[in-house]
């Protein structure tokens, strides 16, 4: 049995915490009755060891062991820095 590590891409929406950030993951879901695709957003708390991310950055994250009550994801890399 293979254990595939889950990786996702999202945009940083908050970086006010020390060594933590909130990443919004957007996905499209088809409505079961009408068939229209609806945008859904999931917010995940992510561990950022070096505080290298800012608001608006596009990041890649991966699932890990629970680090706190709400954090079980860690930063892999910054895909794109936000334009300030």
UniProtKB/Swiss-Prot annotation:
Q: Which InterPro entries match?
A: NA-bd_OB-fold, Ribosomal_uS17, Ribosomal_uS17_bact/chlr, Ribosomal_uS17_CS
| Alphabetical keyword list | Ribonucleoprotein, Ribosomal protein, RNA-binding, rRNA-binding
Q: What is this protein called?
A: Small ribosomal subunit protein uS17
A single MF term (Gene Ontology) = structural constituent of ribosome
**GO cellular component labels:** cytosolic small ribosomal subunit
**Highest taxon listed in the record's lineage:** Bacteria
Family in the record: Belongs to the universal ribosomal protein uS17 family.
Name any Gene Ontology BP term.
translation
Instruction: Fill in the subunit field for this protein.
Output: Part of the 30S ribosomal subunit.
* Physiological role: One of the primary rRNA binding proteins, it binds specifically to the 5'-end of 16S ribosomal RNA.
- NCBIfam families from the xrefs? PRK05610.1, uS17_bact
Q: Which PROSITE patterns match?
A: RIBOSOMAL_S17
